[in-house]
Amino acid sequence: MVVLPSTALVEDRTVIDLTDRASQLRQHVPGRATVSVVVPTLNEVDNIVLVLPRIPWWVDEIVLVDGGSTDGTVAAALAVRPDLRVIIDETPGKGAALRAGWHHARGDIVVTIDADGSTDPAEIPAFIGPLLAGADMVKGSRFVHGAGSADIDLLRRAGNKALTRLVRMLYGGRFTDLCYGYNAFWRRVVPVFEAAGDGFEIETLMNVRALRHDLRVVEVASFEAERIHGQSNLRTFSDGWRVLRTILRERFRRPPEVELAPAMVRLTPATAERGWS
């Protein structure tokens, strides 16, 4: 794994100085939770330059985890956002990339989005709000009121629905969308997700682990757009089978003992009435 300095591929000192000043303005605010956004990439040069500018300016840190792109993704990303933290981790799979990002993130809150444009960074505030109100984790759902998807087909929708019902039956909870990668959580709960899967099943495993450890989880409406350019690496049947195996294997696995750091916020009576899972 290689960590590149944020200015490694950028020569414009004016741009660097401006981003440094913006970073300084975001820091040292008493009581303010800091936010890191983790973005895994692999040959997303045409998409990443469109996604990064949409990330809210007040986000404290963007961690780009690249799996060994050969199309110039990292250079293009740094040209758009010189303040990026770049992690090079060629371990195959989205899950491996996300874990690397979590371990390098320095914010109190970690948000995960996709680099292909399917998850809208403009929704980040909707994920942050419930965390500040007392939730441990916030997950996006494409199937609640106000949500939707321009990308999921009937087969994937049916598979997701069946797997979600299975998780409800085995683990409880009231999740409506099991296989969606837009999530946010306090960094202190990362130990719950340790040793998660390397592939797309990581999103399911995060949800299951959250239930098994009695985390306070909130679903928020999210709209999934079509990827802007290129083809998805998702394989409906093989990845669906991996998700099913993950659900069943985790059911008979003893949950690891995890000692979580104290929460920065407490659940108040007003927020408790909103239906935490």
Residue positions per predicted region:
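Hydrophobic helical membrane-anchoring modules
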Residues: 1-31, 170-172, 195-277
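Short, well-formed alpha-helical segments that are part of the catalytic scaffolds
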Residues: 18-26, 42-57
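Cell-envelope/extracellular polymer assembly enzymes that use nucleotide-activated donors
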Residues: 34-36, 61, 205
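Donor nucleotide-sugar binding loop of glycosyltransferases
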Residues: 44-47, 69, 94, 120
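Acidic helix N-cap motif at the loop->helix transition within catalytic regions
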Residues: 46-50, 71-80
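Conserved donor nucleotide-binding strand/loop of the catalytic core
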Residues: 60-63, 74-104
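A conserved acidic beta->alpha catalytic loop
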Residues: 66-75, 117
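Acceptor/aglycone-binding surface of glycosyltransferases and processive sugar-polymer synthases
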Residues: 89-104, 112, 122-200, 227-246
